[in-house]
């Protein structure tokens, strides 16, 4: 190992130690992380039990998609708790905390990048939508999360932080269009409109809270502390992920016959073969 790499490793370890100490000394921040880890563990066990008797391919796919939500969350929140995906950022000129080092739990964006597509996959399967529409929703969602991460990490320009925030919101609008305009008709045709409508409203209302928290928190205008913002995100995660997934799985387990027949390639296991 070269001297340069040894120095870099030492600095990284020191930084992680400082970050971990800061997390543990901030009760609101620390508790918001560990409560989510504990809940994710319980939810994983619950979802395993709820999905063990599912038989149809489409129902199983919905179950796998919803299972991945707490699995991703517990992994990501463990990264936050260890300080691995948290860092100090010096805010640029023009920011409310310009020149100050602010603790940034940027690992949350990893959680959202991998978990929110699973939420959309589950909703798309429930609505029995077509693959093109599902692909659109998921890719727009990933774009939203990645540009949100860029907005949070940029320290060179206050303006660019808000530019990327605006781009992220534009991706979000595309996701909302799919959820509110395209998929309801698909769900109506699939016979799942009632539960889809409930989950759609739950998802849209809660997801709107994320950009609002970003704007009000230390990443935006800094009206909220890091700990308060973290609890806001954790609360939204609990409702938008675990409660959402529980409601969906409970309905699927009780109405598997409704989702057993599907016209979508993914949900039905492929197109109907042609007659010989």
UniProtKB/Swiss-Prot annotation:
Organism: Haloarcula marismortui (strain ATCC 43049 / DSM 3752 / JCM 8966 / VKM B-1809) (Halobacterium marismortui)
Gene3D superfamilies membership: Rhodopsin 7-helix transmembrane proteins
Record's keyword annotation contains Isomerase: no
Record-annotated membrane-spanning stretches: 31-51, 61-81, 109-129, 134-154, 162-182, 195-215, 220-240
Modified residues (Pyrrolidone carboxylic acid): 21
Keywords: Chromophore, Ion transport, Membrane, Photoreceptor protein, Pyrrolidone carboxylic acid, Receptor, Retinal protein, Sensory transduction, Transmembrane, Transmembrane helix, Transport
Major subcellular location class: membrane
Keyword Ion transport attributed: yes
Source domain of life: Archaea
Induction: Expressed constitutively throughout the growth phases, both in presence and absence of white light.
Modified how: The covalent binding of retinal to the apoprotein, bacterioopsin, generates bacteriorhodopsin.
Entry-linked InterPro entries: Arc/bac/fun_rhodopsins (IPR001425), Rhodopsin_retinal_BS (IPR018229)
Localization per Swiss-Prot or TrEMBL: Membrane
Family statement: Belongs to the archaeal/bacterial/fungal opsin family.
Pfam families: Bac_rhodopsin
CDD domains, A to Z: 7tm_Halorhodopsin
Residues modified to N6-(retinylidene)lysine: 241
Record GO biological process: phototransduction
Function statement: Light-driven chloride pump.
A GO molecular function held by the record: photoreceptor activity
Family annotation (PROSITE patterns): BACTERIAL_OPSIN_1, BACTERIAL_OPSIN_RET
CC annotations in GO: membrane
UniProt name for this protein: Halorhodopsin
Propeptide: 1-20
Topology class, membrane: Multi-pass membrane protein
């Amino acid at each position: 190992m070269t001297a340069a790499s040894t120095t870099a490793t030492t600095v990284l370890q020191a930084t992680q130690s400082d970050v971990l100490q800061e997390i543990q000394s901030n009760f609101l921040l620390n508790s918001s992380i560990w409560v989510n880890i504990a809940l994710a563990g319980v939810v994983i066990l619950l979802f395993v039990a709820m999905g063990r008797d599912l038989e149809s391919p489409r129902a199983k796919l919905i179950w796998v998609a919803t299972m991945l939500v707490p699995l991703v969350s517990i992994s990501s929140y463990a990264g936050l708790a260890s300080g691995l995906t948290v860092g100090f950022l010096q805010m640029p000129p023009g920011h409310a905390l310009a020149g100050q080092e602010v603790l940034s739990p940027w690992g949350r964006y990893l959680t959202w990048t991998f978990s929110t597509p699973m939420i959309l996959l589950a909703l798309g399967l429930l609505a029995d939508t077509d693959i093109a529409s599902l692909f659109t929703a998921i890719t727009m969602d990933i774009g939203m999360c990645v540009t949100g991460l860029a907005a949070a990490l940029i320290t060179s320009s206050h303006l660019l932080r808000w530019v990327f925030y605006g781009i992220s919101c534009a991706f979000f609008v595309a996701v909302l269009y799919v959820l509110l305009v395209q998929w309801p008709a698909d769900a109506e045709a699939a016979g799942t409109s009632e539960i889809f409508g409930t989950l759609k409203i739950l998802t849209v209302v809660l997801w709107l809270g994320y950009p609002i928290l970003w704007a009000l928190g230390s990443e935006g205008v800094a009206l909220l502390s890091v700990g308060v913002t973290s609890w806001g995100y954790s609360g939204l995660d609990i409702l938008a992920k675990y409660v959402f997934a529980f409601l969906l799985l409970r309905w699927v387990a009780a109405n598997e016959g409704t989702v057993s027949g599907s016209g979508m390639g993914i949900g039905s296991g492929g197109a109907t073969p042609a007659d010989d």
